[in-house]
């Protein structure tokens, strides 16, 4: 998320960062503003409908309109079906899937006022293929994939586009403590990709930037797979 925010700011976008991690969010906000960008941070728990409405209101109050939304909050868990508690299932679904729904719902009225917009939902390669683990995670990201398509169909006539992004294994704060936490696991993860490496946040950010831009104006309801060939096998 921080990489995307900085890249958007460099391209001239006015950026609103929403996160429960206030220290990290404020740090990114300061870095963008200190380098000539325009950015504000708002505290946002993506499972809270009121906080989504507040975040959208803050964006419009500060910058005049809202025409891009990137839903990229998420948690990653690797439990198999019998290892997954009901509480864990609900937590993963609430953050990864419900959060996307609430953000989209809150943003659409302002995008309508703006004359259109682009919604980019970060899904996963595990929304496209099955997994020997990550039961709740894969299900949540599959929900994001199909919710994106429904959003695209419902709002295309109003100039509001919606597309999903499907990363492979990316080196982020979410994966570093889990599937990339040892050198052996890093090598194994790299070897799973035909391109022979782990993805970097910039690999995803460039795709998100494209989907937010007018260059992708004929894309909606699509899946942008950025996974080093992982799901092509």
Language-model regions, residue ranges each:
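Residue(s) in the substrate-gating loop at a strand-loop-helix junction
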Residues: 124
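Substrate-binding pocket helix/loop in short-chain dehydrogenase/reductase
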Residues: 80-81, 85-90, 185, 189
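Canonical Rossmann dinucleotide-binding motif of NAD(H)/NADP(H)-dependent dehydrogenases/reductases
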Residues: 1-16
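Active-site helix of classical SDR
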Residues: 104, 140, 148
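Short C-terminal tail/terminal secondary-structure segment
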Residues: 129, 208-209, 220-233
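Active-site loop immediately N-terminal to the catalytic Tyr-X3-Lys motif
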Residues: 79-82, 129-135, 157-158, 196, ...
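Alpha-helical segment proximal to the catalytic Tyr-Lys
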Residues: 109, 153-157, 217
